[in-house]
Curated annotation (Swiss-Prot):
UniProt cross-references to NCBIfam families, sorted A to Z: tegu_FGAM_synt
Predominant subcellular localization, coarse grouping: virion
Record gene name: 75
Any one cellular-component term (Gene Ontology): viral tegument
Protein name according to UniProt: Probable membrane antigen 75
Organism: Alcelaphine herpesvirus 1 (strain C500)
Keywords: Virion, Virion tegument
Compartments it resides in: Virion tegument
Highest taxon, organism lineage: Viruses
Length: 1315
C-alpha cells in the first residue's frame, strides 16, 4: 500500500499483519491520580468503585510474505516470542484479543497510547532489537498502549471527558485509539510522519552561532574569552587535564589490561534539551574512545505561585524531563553526582518565563591520550555513520516515547572502544560535530572541515533506500533534493559521523586490514550499525550521487552513478530572529527597586521567613531526585550527594576517582604465590595503606546564580563562579591553577549578544585574577525555536531567561575532605564570608516574596582566592571538621542543613549590630565551618589579614531534645526540634514522591524509616578496622575472570575493578564473541553486572536469555555457559537486576538438574524466579542493610557469615517474584537464600518488610546461591562498596574502618581458586 504523508511525497509500506492484545495491569501513576481524585465523589465526574479497570494494549505488527503457507508458522512463532519477551510487563496475566471489560450503560472505555503513524517509539526499537538477537526479523513494530474502563454515576459529556483525558494522557505524545482499531495506519520505518517534519527555517541558534562559531576573520568568541594557561585545548571550546587510565582487557584483542596517560574533559550544555544523548555524543566526537566518570544534572522552571508551589501537572512536567535525562545517564553508565533543581518565582519585577523546563548537563570523561591523535584528513577517506538512524521527535514530552536510545549509543561506544583497542596507529581523520542542536547536514559540513565528499544514495539509511527503490522516479512527484532534505539531511538524528583512512593498517594481533574493515568487524561483534556513506573528495561541498543501479563499493577504484546535485556550507553569518508579533524594541517594565536600607523588613516574621525558605523547592531536599538516579554505578565515586546517616543530599561537591586500580610501583611487596597458602586471618593482617596514596581523582561542583544574573548579568555571573569555589573549598586539597571552570550559557538573542559578551569578558577577567582556567563549552538561545512552545494566551515576558552555569573540575590526589555533618559537641560554628552585609539582591528570599532589594555588588577576586586558600588549609590540617557553603537560602539555611544529619542542640546568634533578616538570608560568598573553640583565634587572624569576615555564630551541645534555634538581640526568634526541621526541609521532596510515584499509601508511615543503619562485623571488626588490605595491580594469569557483557551494555567497571584489585586476571567478554563450547575453559570466574542500556532492564534480561535458548542449536554461547557452570572449579557472581536475573536462571537450572537421576538432562528454560518493580515504580539508589545468615551456603559470602552490612542497591526491579507458588519456601528450605534485605537494627531477625528498606515491599530475599555455593546472584552490588571510601556513610564507631568487609568476597574467591 502507499500513502501520501506530505504534499508531493509518496510513501510505500510493506505488507504486514497487526495483532492487538489486552492484558490486565496496575493503574498508571496518572490513572491512579484520577481514581484518587474522582472515585465516589459528588459531581459530574464520579467514578464508581469496583468498576475501574486498567489494561495494557500490546500492538504487534509483523511483515507478511507473499506465500501464505509460510506466514502462518513464522508469524505465530514471532508472536509467541513477543509474548515471552514482554512477560515481565504482562505479569502472567491472561492475554485477550479484546478488552475483558465490555461496555455497558454509563461505561466509559478510553484507549490511548503512542501515535502509530509516527516513527516507532524507543520501546519498540528496544523490543525489535532484542527479537533480532533471537533471529526474529519479521517483527516490524511493537507498541504498548493503555485502556482504562470505568463506570460513571452520570452520563459523561464532552467537557467531563476532557477532564478525564487531561488527567491521564499527554496532549503532545499520546492519542486516543478508536474502538476496534479500524482503518489505522502503522508506520514501521524511521521516516517521519507529516507533523514531525522539521521546517528548515528557524532552526538556527543565533546565540550559539555568535558565541561558539567563527564569524568572518575573527576566531570564535568562546575562544577569545577562554583563559587556559595551564591546560591544552583540542578544540576551541574544550579544556582538558592530564591523568592516567587503566584500559580494561577485551578478550578478542588477546591483550592484558594496561595503564596509559589519560586526558580528562568536561562537556557542559544548558538549554532546551530534546536529544538526551546529544551531549554525550558531542563529547564522544572530541574523545572518540573515552570512559564516563561522572555527570551533573540541573533543571530550571518558572512558576507564578507563591514559593513555587506546583500542581501535579507542573511537577510532572519538570521532573519527568529531569528524570528521563537522568535515566539516559544511568543507561549510558555515567553516575550523576551533582546538580540542582531551581524553581524561579515569576513575580515582582523579575518577569521571566520559561515555556518548558530548561536542563543543564555536564559530563566528565577520560580518554587515553594517544587516542586523541588523528590521521591526515584528505581525499579518499571513507565517510562513516555509526549507530541506528532514527530521526528525533522534537516535541516529545511525558512519557517520552521518543527518547534517545541509550542501548544504541552504548553499541557505538562499544564499537569505538573495541576499534581503538585493536588498531595500532591513528586511523580516524575527522570526528567533528557542529555545535548546538544541529541537523545531519550541519554535522556533515562540520565533519568535512570545509572539504568535500561524494555521498551515495545506496548508502543512505535502509528505510529511505527502500522507498527510493520501490517508487519509480517519475512518481516521486518532488525533486530528489527535497525528498532527501525532508527525510535525511534536515533531520536531527543521533548518529555519530567520522572519516577514516582507506589504507591498510596493522592490528594489535599483527594483521593488516583497512580501518573500515576493522571497524566493521568490531561493530558486528557489538551489533552496531555501520553506514559507509561515501568518500571525501577535493571538490568542496556534499555531492549526492545516484548509484541505485550500481551501488557504491569502497574497495573499488572506480565508482559509477549519476551526480544529482551538490550542497554547500552556508556562510558563517548568523541572522537574528524575533518572535511573530514581537516588536523590535521591547517595552521595559518599570521595576521598583527598594533601597538597601532595611525599613521594609518591619512586617516580616523571622520564624515564618525561615520556614518558607526551607519549604522552597530551590532550598529544600532534593532526595526525590538523588535517591532515584545512579550516583555510584561505575564504582569510581567517592563522594556523591548523599551524606550522613540519613543519606541527605547535602554534599557541596563530588569526588570521582580516575581509576580504582593502582599501577605497580617498582617491586611490589606482595607475591602471587602467597594466595596458595593465604587464610582469611592472614589476609586481615596485610596492611598496604600506601597502595591508594596519591591516587588521582577529580573534585567536581556546579555554580549557578540565575536570580543574580537577572539583576546584574556580569556581577551575577561572577557570583556563579564564586559559588563554584565555595562548593569546592571544603573538598580535598586542590590548586586553583588546576581548576577548570567550564561555562554554559543561555541568552535571549538580539543586539549581537553584546550583553552576553560583556558578561563572558567579565568572567574571563575574574578567572585570570583568581588564577583558574576558564572555557565556554556551549551557548544556546532561551527563545524557543518552535513556536508551538509559545503560549500566545500569556503576554510575552519582558525578557527571556538569561543565565550561566559553571561546572568545575580539579585534579586531586587525596580524599581528605569535610562534609556538612556536625561532628562533636563542644565545637563551635564559625561564619567566614567576604561581606555578610552586602544585601539581599538576587537571593531566594527576594524571589519568594517578589521583592526587588537593590543591585548585585561586585566581588573581590583576591578576597575570593584568600577565602578558598584559608578554608582548604583548615580542612587539610584537620582544624575544620565539617562545613557547608552559604548559598541558596542564605546563612540560616546553611546552618540548618548542617544540623539535619545529627541530634545535637545548636543555638545560633546573630552578631550584634547586624540586622537579623539581612544577615540570615544574605547569600554572600562564604562558608560555615565547625572547629574547636581553641582554634578560633588563629582562624580569625588569617581572615583578618585577608580582609574577610570571621565570626563564631553557634555552639554545639548535647541535650535531652535536639533542636536548632536562632537568637537575635537576646531573643529567640526561631526554634524548632531537629525532627520537625527535617520534616519541613523534606516537605517538597516528600510531596513529589507521593504525587509522582506508584501507590505508596500502604508504606506511607514507613517512608521515613531510612538511614541510620546499624552494622555487625562479627569477629572480624578488629582486623577490618586496623589493617588496610589492598594490592597493587599484579594479575594472576592462572586465575582469569570474565566480566560478561551484551551488545548495548555499558562496561561493568565496578566488577572489573573489584576482581582486578583481588589480583585476578580480568577480561571484558561480549556474549557474541563466544565461538566454542570450550570458550571459558581458561576462566575460573564469571561476573555479570547491571549496565544494561535498554529502557526496561528486565525485558532486556529476558531477551538476553531467550536469545541464548532459541539459538542454542546455532550458537555455542549457551553450551559454553552450561559447560562452565557444571565445572567443579568455577565460580560466578551476578549483580543488580540484570546480573541477578541472568545468573538466577542458571542457578535454578543447576538446582533442578541435581534431582535428575543418571544421565538425564533437562532442557534449559526460564525458571519460575523473576523480579518485580520497586514499590515506588521508579529507579532507586539506596544505601540499605543486608543480612548474611550464619548458614549461608555461598562460598563467596563465607567471610561475612552472620554479618549485617550496608551496601549500595540500585535499580528498578529490586524484588523477587515467583511464577509458581512455593518457590521462596523451597529456596529457604534448600539453603539457597544467600542474603536478605534488613531493617535498621543489626538484630539477625530484623528482616526488612517495608519500602524503602525493602525496595519492593514484598520478598526480602536479596540474593541466592547454588547448591554447592559456587555461584551467587545478588540484587546488591558488593563491588560498589569494595573500599571504605566508597561507602555512603561510616556509622558511629566505624569511622576509621580501613578495609571494607565487602572486599573479602573477592579476596575469598582468589584464595578459593588457589586452594
Amino acid at each position: 500500500m502507499s500513502l501520501y504523508l506530505l504534499p508531493n511525497i509518496r510513501r510505500v509500506f510493506k505488507d504486514s499483519l497487526t495483532r492487538i492484545w489486552f492484558v490486565d495491569t496496575d493503574y498508571s501513576i496518572e490513572e491512579e491520580q484520577l481514581v484518587m481524585k474522582f472515585m465516589d465523589v459528588p459531581g459530574d465526574l464520579s467514578l464508581i468503585s469496583g468498576t475501574i479497570f486498567s489494561e495494557l494494549i500490546i500492538i504487534v505488527t509483523i511483515e507478511t510474505s507473499h506465500t501464505a503457507s509460510d506466514d502462518e508458522s513464522s508469524y505465530e512463532r514471532a508472536l509467541a516470542a513477543v509474548r515471552e519477551l514482554l512477560s515481565p510487563l504482562m505479569k502472567n496475566a491472561t492475554v485477550s484479543p479484546i478488552s475483558r471489560y465490555p461496555k455497558r450503560q454509563r461505561t466509559t472505555k478510553i484507549m490511548y497510547g503512542p501515535d502509530l503513524k509516527r516513527i516507532p517509539t524507543n520501546f519498540s526499537r528496544d523490543v525489535m532489537d532484542l527479537l533480532q538477537q533471537q533471529g526474529i526479523t519479521s517483527v516490524m513494530r511493537v507498541e504498548v498502549g493503555r485502556c482504562l474502563t470505568f463506570d460513571n454515576r452520570h452520563e459523561l459529556y464532552d467537557i467531563t471527558m476532557d477532564m478525564v483525558l487531561k488527567e491521564i494522557k499527554s496532549k503532545e505524545s499520546q492519542i486516543i485509539y478508536m474502538e476496534g482499531f479500524e482503518n489505522f495506519t502503522v508506520n514501521t520505518e524511521p521516516i517521519h510522519y507529516a507533523s514531525d517534519i522539521i521546517q528548515v527555517t528557524g532552526t538556527e541558534d543565533y546565540v550559539c552561532d555568535m558565541i561558539m562559531k567563527k564569524i568572518g576573520p575573527d576566531v570564535p568568541f568562546a575562544q577569545q574569552v577562554a583563559y587556559l594557561p595551564n591546560v591544552s585545548i583540542p578544540s576551541t571550546s574544550v579544556a582538558t587535564a592530564l591523568s592516567f587510565k587503566l584500559r580494561a582487557a577485551m578478550y578478542f584483542t588477546k591483550e592484558m589490561s594496561s595503564f596509559h596517560y589519560a586526558i580528562l574533559q568536561c562537556q557542559g550544555n544548558l538549554g532546551f534539551i530534546s536529544q538526551q544523548t546529544d551531549g554525550l555524543r558531542m563529547q564522544r566526537s572530541i574523545l572518540m574512545e573515552n570512559s564516563p566518570l561522572a555527570s551533573c544534572l540541573g533543571a530550571y522552571v518558572t512558576n507564578f505561585a507563591f514559593n513555587c508551589r506546583q500542581d501535579y501537572k507542573e511537577m510532572k512536567k519538570l521532573y519527568t524531563s529531569l528524570m528521563v535525562q537522568a535515566a539516559t545517564n544511568i543507561r549510558a553508565g555515567s553516575p550523576t553526582v551533582g546538580g540542582f533543581v531551581r524553581l524561579i518565582c515569576n513575580n515582582g519585577g523579575l518577569k521571566v518565563k520559561l515555556y518548558r523546563p530548561m536542563l543543564y548537563e555536564c559530563h566528565l570523561a577520560s580518554s587515553i591520550g594517544s587516542n586523541l591523535k588523528t590521521a591526515d584528513f584528505r581525499p579518499g577517506n571513507i565517510l562513516v555513520a555509526l549507530g541506528q538512524f532514527y530521526p528525533s521527535v522534537l516535541d516529545d514530552t511525558h512519557p517520552f516515547y521518543y527518547r534517545d536510545s541509550a542501548a544504541d549509543y552504548n553499541k557505538v561506544v562499544q564499537a569505538l572502544n573495541g576499534f581503538y583497542c585493536t588498531v595500532t596507529s591513528p586511523c580516524v581523520t575527522s570526528s567533528l560535530r557542529d555545535l548546538g542542536k544541529k541537523t545531519v547536514k550541519q554535522h556533515l559540513f562540520a565533519l568535512l572541515k570545509n572539504g568535500g565528499a561524494n555521498l551515495y544514495i545506496s548508502c543512505l539509511p535502509a528505510a529511505l533506500v527502500y522507498q527510493l527503490q520501490r517508487i519509480p522516479e517519475t512518481e516521486w512527484l518532488c525533486s530528489l533534493e527535497h525528498l532527501l532534505d525532508v527525510y535525511f539531511f534536515n533531520t536531527y538524528a543521533n548518529i555519530l559521523f567520522l572519516t577514516v583512512k582507506n589504507t591498510s593498517e596493522y592490528t594489535t594481533l599483527g594483521q593488516q586490514f583497512k580501518p573500515i574493515e576493522i571497524l566493521q568487524n568490531v561493530a558486528r561483534l557489538f551489533k552496531c550499525d555501520v553506514h559507509i556513506l561515501g568518500e571525501t573528495v577535493d571538490k568542496i561541498g556534499i555531492h549526492v550521487i545516484n548509484d541505485l543501479g550500481n551501488p557504491y563499493n569502497y574497495t573499488s577504484r572506480r565508482h559509477y552513478g549519476q551526480h544529482c546535485y551538490s550542497m554547500f556550507k552556508p556562510p558563517e553569518n548568523p541572522q537574528d530572529y524575533t518572535l511573530p508579533g514581537a516588536s523590535e524594541e521591547e517595552e521595559e517594565l518599570e521595576c521598583v527597586v527598594l533601597t538597601p536600607g532595611l525599613d521594609w523588613a518591619q512586617g516580616f516574621v523571622i520564624e515564618e521567613c525561615i520556614r518558607n525558605t526551607l519549604l522552597s523547592p530551590t532550598v529544600g531536599s532534593k532526595a526525590f531526585v538523588v535517591q532515584h538516579i545512579d550516583r555510584c554505578g561505575n564504582g569510581l565515586v567517592v563522594q556523591q550527594p548523599g551524606v550522613g546517616r540519613f543519606d541527605f543530599p547535602l554534599a557541596d561537591y563530588s569526588l570521582v576517582l580516575h581509576s580504582l586500580v593502582k599501577p605497580p610501583m617498582g617491586d611490589t611487596p606482595d607475591s602471587l604465590a602467597m594466595w596458595k597458602s593465604l587464610s582469611l586471618e592472614d589476609l586481615l593482617n596485610i596492611n598496604n595503606a600506601e597502595v591508594h596514596e596519591n591516587i588521582p581523582a577529580s573534585c567536581m561542583a556546579v555554580g549557578e546564580q540565575p536570580l543574580k544574573v537577572a539583576a546584574s548579568p556580569s556581577n551575577g555571573a561572577l557570583r556563579a563562579i564564586a559559588e563554584l569555589l565555595t562548593n569546592l573549598m571544603l573538598g580535598p586539597k586542590m590548586l586553583l591553577s588546576n581548576l577548570i571552570v567550564t561555562a554554559s550559557v543561555t541568552w535571549e538573542s538580539g543586539q549581537s549578544c553584546e550583553e552576553l559578551k560583556a558578561m563572558l569578558r567579565a568572567c574571563r577577567a575574574f578567572a585570570e585574577q583568581l588564577g583558574v582556567n576558564f572555557v565556554v563549552s556551549s551557548a544556546s538561545s532561551s527563545v524557543p525555536q518552535d513556536s508551538r512552545h509559545l503560549n500566545t494566551g500569556i503576554p510575552r515576558p519582558s525578557k527571556f531567561f538569561k543565565n550561566i552555569v559553571c561546572s568545575g573540575t580539579c585534579k586531586v590526589t587525596s580524599v581528605k575532605r569535610a562534609l556538612p555533618v556536625l561532628q562533636k559537641a563542644g565545637n563551635i560554628l564559625v561564619h567566614v564570608s567576604i561581606d555578610p552585609t552586602e544585601g539581599l539582591a538576587g537571593t531566594v528570599f527576594e524571589n519568594i516574596y517578589g521583592l526587588s532589594l537593590g543591585t548585585v555588588s561586585e566581588i573581590s577576586a583576591p578576597k575570593m582566592a584568600a577565602l578558598f586558600a584559608i578554608i582548604q588549609d583548615g580542612v587539610q590540617e584537620g582544624v575544620i571538621v565539617s562545613g557547608h557553603d552559604v548559598s541558596d537560602g542564605g546563612l540560616v539555611a546553611c546552618v540548618a542543613e548542617l544540623c539535619l544529619s545529627t541530634e545535637f542542640v545548636v543555638r545560633m546568634t546573630v552578631p550584634e549590630g547586624l540586622h537579623a533578616l539581612g544577615y540570615l538570608f544574605a547569600e554572600s560568598p562564604g562558608v560555615v565551618v565547625e572547629i574547636s573553640p581553641n582554634q578560633l583565634p588563629a582562624l580569625r587572624d588569617k581572615c583578618s589579614a585577608a580582609g574577610l569576615f570571621c565570626q563564631d555564630i553557634a555552639y554545639i551541645t548535647n541535650g535531652d531534645e535536639s533542636f536548632f534555634s536562632v537568637v537575635s538581640n537576646g531573643k529567640i526568634v526561631f526554634q524548632q526540634p531537629l525532627s520537625s526541621l527535617r520534616a519541613t526541609w523534606s516537605t517538597y521532596s516528600d510531596g513529589l514522591l507521593s504525587a509522582l510515584c506508584s501507590d505508596l499509601e500502604e508504606d506511607e508511615r514507613h517512608k521515613g524509616d531510612y538511614g541510620c543503619n546499624e552494622v555487625d562485623f562479627r569477629g572480624l571488626k578488629e582486623g577490618l578496622m586496623n589493617n588496610y588490605v589492598a594490592f597493587y595491580y599484579n594479575p594472576d594469569i592462572q586465575n582469569k575472570v570474565a566480566v560478561l557483557t551484551w551488545p548495548g551494555m555499558t562496561k561493568d567497571e565496578s566488577l572489573f575493578w573489584a576482581f582486578t584489585n583481588a589480583q585476578f586476571d580480568t577480561y571484558m567478554v561480549c556474549i557474541t564473541e563466544i565461538n566454542s563450547p570450550s570458550f571459558f575453559n581458561d576462566f575460573r570466574g564469571l561476573a555479570i553486572g547491571n549496565g544494561v542500556g535498554y529502557t526496561e532492564p528486565l525485558v532486556a534480561a529476558v531477551g538476553a536469555l531467550t536469545a541464548l535458548i532459541h539459538t542454542q542449536g546455532d550458537s555455542p554461547a549457551l553450551r559454553a555457559l552450561l559447560h562452565f557452570f557444571n565445572r567443579a572449579d568455577t565460580f560466578s557472581l551476578g549483580c543488580g537486576e540484570f546480573g541477578f536475573f541472568i545468573l538466577s536462571q542458571f542457578i535454578y537450572y543447576l538446582h533442578e538438574q541435581s534431582f535428575l537421576v543418571g544421565h538425564q538432562h533437562e532442557e534449559f528454560k526460564l525458571s519460575p524466579i523473576s523480579l518485580e518493580k520497586t514499590k515506588s515504580g521508579i529507579y532507586e539508589s539506596r544505601w540499605l542493610s543486608v543480612h548474611i545468615p550464619e548458614t549461608t551456603g555461598s562460598i563467596m559470602l563465607a567471610p561475612c557469615r552472620g554479618m549485617v552490612l550496608p551496601c549500595w542497591v540500585q535499580g528498578t526491579y529490586l524484588g523477587l517474584s515467583y511464577k509458581t507458588d512455593g518457590v521462596e519456601s523451597e529456596l529457604y528450605n534448600e539453603n539457597l537464600v544467600a542474603c536478605s534485605f534488613h531493617g535498621k537494627s543489626s538484630s539477625s531477625e530484623n528482616f526488612a518488610r517495608h519500602y524503602p528498606r525493602n525496595p519492593s515491599g514484598n520478598s526480602s530475599v536479596a540474593g541466592i546461591c547454588s547448591d554447592d555455593g559456587r555461584h551467587l546472584a545478588t540484587l546488591i552490588d558488593p563491588s560498589l562498596s569494595f573500599f571504605p571510601f566508597q561507602w555512603q556513610h561510616l556509622p558511629s564507631g566505624y569511622e576509621r574502618m580501613q578495609t571494607s568487609p565487602w572486599s573479602l568476597l573477592f579476596y575469598q574467591m582468589h584464595m578459593w581458586c588457589c586452594s
